[in-house]
């Protein structure tokens, strides 16, 4: 039986095999070492690419047709935030995997909140950069001024929430 790491390795290896598959997948390409598409499974890493590994790849996606809702932006898609229920993107239409009207992007630093000192940001859809909601003094991209209360007994200091006593030192 395999360890979890070996199982994961085999899953990734199998995926990569599909990426490089072509019409000559099991043809003998000489003594350059094992081919990625070899029928034998090996845990030994390849030292170099053999000629079979660098043949002209497929000119199209392996998955036909593209799948919307798998969190992977495929050919023809512009975004993919999963199926409609778990999708939390205001910029991506989960049903079509196309950007909402007037939007040009769906991801970037403005989508992730670091802590309570990081004000809510708005994905404008025009850039992956933040466009923050300014409710108090702003130091850039959603960061508030030092001393601003962020939770009970906590204030912002150096862009992080710290205990009031710690900030006073």
Swiss-Prot record:
Cofactor(s), by name: Zn(2+)
Residue span of motif D/ECD-tripeptide: 116-118
GO biological process, alphabetically ordered: proteolysis; venom-mediated blood coagulation
Classification via InterPro entries: Disintegrin_dom, Disintegrin_dom_sf
Cysteine pairs bridged by disulfides in the record: 68-97, 79-92, 81-87, 105-111, 110-123, 150-161
Any one of the GO CC terms: plasma membrane
Entry GO MF terms: metal ion binding; metalloendopeptidase activity; peptidase activator activity; toxin activity
Keyword terms: Blood coagulation cascade activating toxin, Disulfide bond, Hemostasis impairing toxin, Hydrolase, Metal-binding, Metalloprotease, Protease, Prothrombin activator, Secreted, Toxin, Zinc
Activity regulation, per record: Inhibited by EDTA, but not by PMSF.
Entry comment describing in which tissues the protein is expressed: Expressed by the venom gland.
Domain Peptidase M12B: 14-57
Locations listed in the record: Secreted
Domain Disintegrin span(s) in chain numbering: 65-129
Cofactor note: Binds 1 zinc ion per subunit.
The protein's Enzyme Commission number: 3.4.24.-
Family, as annotated: Belongs to the venom metalloproteinase (M12B) family. P-III subfamily. P-IIIa sub-subfamily.
Subunit structure and binding partners: Monomer.
Primary role: Snake venom zinc metalloproteinase that calcium-independently catalyzes the conversion of prothrombin (F2) to alpha-thrombin through the formation of a thrombin intermediate.
Misc remark: Negative results: does not have an affect on factor X (F10) and fibrinogen.
Protein's name according to its UniProt entry: Zinc metalloproteinase-disintegrin-like mikarin
